[in-house]
Amino acid sequence: MFPEQQKEEFVSVWVRDPRIQKEDFWHSYIDYEICIHTNSMCFTMKTSCVRRRYREFVWLRQRLQSNALLVQLPELPSKNLFFNMNNRQHVDQRRQGLEDFLRKVLQNALLLSDSSLHLFLQSHLNSEDIEACVSGQTKYSVEEAIHKFALMNRRFPEEEEEGKKDADVEYDSESSSSGLGHSSDDSSSHGCKTSPALQES
């Protein structure tokens, strides 16, 4: 027997590094970095990072629910009318709620087989493009979309932290999971695959 070959499968997910993005002159929003580290066979890529905003999480939950009607999906953090993107406590509570949501989703084998989830986690595609890709209306497959994004973004935070611990590039400071950074729109990820599934809210 080779014990090293019998390692239990795992999927780890972090939601971190909230950043304020400018949508236009009057409007801004916060997006979050979603990082995946896994040895699961259902994922094409074993590490990835991508940026998503709250509205995209709402779309994902509706999409997953429409494809798994009998599954009780976890709740997202509620949309607070008094949410203040400059309030660190508000931002971190939402970040933690989004992370808890994804952790519970990734524990469900049926949800884990949905290609929409994998494209959400490991590609730069928006909701409309995810729907088109999953339904076979694009020139690229789910796996190709993920690989393409992986080639564009070869970075994973744990690797950075290992090599740059002294450079303050970790889970603390201003752009950490509980901090709040500012930047222009940017996405980073590395891919994963499986099967299909709705529509933007």
Swiss-Prot record:
Binding residues annotated for a 1,2-diacyl-sn-glycero-3-phospho-(1D-myo-inositol-3-phosphate), in chain numbering: R53, K79, R94
Location, primary (coarse class): cytoplasm
Molecular function in Gene Ontology: 1-phosphatidylinositol binding; ATPase binding
GO biological process annotation, one example: bone remodeling
GO cellular component terms listed in the entry, alphabetical order: apical cytoplasm; centrosome; endoplasmic reticulum; extrinsic component of endosome membrane; nucleus; secretory granule
Tissue expression per record: Expressed in femur, calvariae and teeth.
Residues covered by region (Disordered): 155-201
Keywords annotated in UniProt: Cilium biogenesis/degradation, Cytoplasm, Cytoskeleton, Endosome, Lipid-binding, Membrane, Protein transport, Transport
Subcellular location per the Swiss-Prot or TrEMBL entry: Cytoplasm; Endosome membrane; Cytoplasm, Cytoskeleton, Microtubule organizing center, Centrosome
Record's bilayer topology term: Peripheral membrane protein
Region feature Required for interaction with ATP6V1D, mapped onto this chain: 8-125
InterPro entries linked: PX_dom, PX_dom_sf, SNX10/11
Residue ranges constituting the PX domain according to the UniProt record: 10-127
Superkingdom of the organism of origin: Eukaryota
Subunit details: Interacts with ATP6V1D; may play a role in ciliogenesis.
Family as reported in the entry's similarity comment: Belongs to the sorting nexin family.
Job of this protein: Probable phosphoinositide-binding protein involved in protein sorting and membrane trafficking in endosomes. Plays a role in cilium biogenesis through regulation of the transport and the localization of proteins to the cilium. Required for the localization to the cilium of V-ATPase subunit ATP6V1D and ATP6V0D1, and RAB8A. Involved in osteoclast differentiation and therefore bone resorption.
Entry comment, domain topic: The PX domain mediates interaction with membranes enriched in phosphatidylinositol 3-phosphate.
Protein name: Sorting nexin-10
Lineage: Eukaryota, Metazoa, Chordata, Craniata, Vertebrata
Gene: Snx10
